[in-house]
């Protein structure tokens, strides 16, 4: 079961592959088309496993940590697929049939972060017209993914640390605490250790989040995977545009 913070449930479409190779167009006979079999991925598991040394190392670390319940800090540049890695860790874990809740920490104003993370009860503040479950309660039994965790305010970091230490949350306006059984995955494109040294990120929270660290390689480190990625995106483009482009010329 995969859900994002907006409670969208992703279904699993039937994967398709490109099996054949043909010239790019009828008029281009100078170079044969170059084609690599498109990887089988789904919306539920969009991870593309490459053949480059960097990709193999990434897969090795994912397979190593996924069966455990350790917190994982996923580091990498923007656009390298940190959430995709988090989803794969979840799908390879014992929690695979439980919720996966992805939270963009950078998109949550600090004033409402407590409500977003821990929920609230009706009438607890102006605008609280109904009870609301927070992301932690929604992820109960499963995995919560805290994307761009370095963007949280210092106050919100304190609240998050307490929830992670005690595995209990208290919705705003409630007198009762709720026990939560969750695995925490976090991601950042920042150097959190540098942020700790500057006093912008709590050291105790940093150590709580990085029981295991995975660094997602950049595309420049995965040059051997380029044709695999190209084949995947070509297949998606064919599907969306209703075309039947079969491959790439050697020049391309």
Pin down the residues of each PLM region:
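Conserved ASCE P-loop NTPase core motifs with emphasis on AAA+ ATPases
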Residues: 1-54, 60
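AAA+ ATPase active-site-proximal loops
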Residues: 33-179, 184-190, 195, 219, ...
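Short, solvent-exposed beta-strand edge segments and adjacent coil->beta transition regions
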Residues: 43-45, 211-214
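ABC-type ATPase nucleotide-binding domain
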Residues: 87, 208, 212
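Charged helix-capping and loop-helix junction motifs
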Residues: 198-201
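Conserved AAA+ ATPase "SRH/arginine-finger" region at the nucleotide-binding site
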Residues: 213-225
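Conserved Sensor-2/SRH helix of P-loop NTPases
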Residues: 225-230, 234
């Amino acid at each position: 079961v995969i859900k994002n913070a907006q409670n969208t449930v992703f279904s699993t479409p039937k994967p398709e592959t490109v099996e054949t190779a043909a010239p790019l167009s009828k008029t281009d006979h100078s170079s044969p088309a170059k084609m690599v079999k498109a990887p089988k991925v789904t919306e539920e598991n969009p991870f593309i496993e490459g053949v480059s040394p960097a990709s193999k190392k990434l897969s090795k670390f994912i397979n190593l940590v996924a069966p455990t319940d350790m917190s994982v800090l996923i580091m990498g540049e923007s656009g390298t697929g940190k959430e995709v890695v988090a989803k794969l860790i979840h799908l390879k874990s014992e929690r695979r049939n439980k919720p996966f809740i992805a939270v963009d920490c950078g998109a949550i104003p600090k004033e409402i972060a407590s409500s977003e993370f821990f929920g609230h009860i009706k009438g607890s503040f102006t605008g609280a017209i109904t009870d609301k479950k927070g992301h932690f309660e929604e992820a109960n039994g499963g995995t919560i993914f805290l994307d761009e965790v370095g963007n949280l305010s210092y106050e919100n970091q304190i609240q998050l640390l307490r929830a992670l230490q005690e595995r209990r949350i208290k919705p705003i306006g409630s007198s009762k605490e709720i026990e939560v059984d969750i695995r925490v995955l976090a991601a950042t494109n920042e150097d959190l250790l540098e942020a700790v040294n500057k006093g912008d990120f709590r050291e105790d929270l940093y150590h709580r989040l990085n029981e295991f660290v995975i660094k997602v390689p950049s595309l420049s480190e995965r040059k051997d995977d380029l044709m695999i990625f190209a084949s995947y995106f070509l297949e998606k483009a064919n599907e969306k545009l209703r075309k039947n482009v079969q491959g790439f010329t050697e020049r391309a």
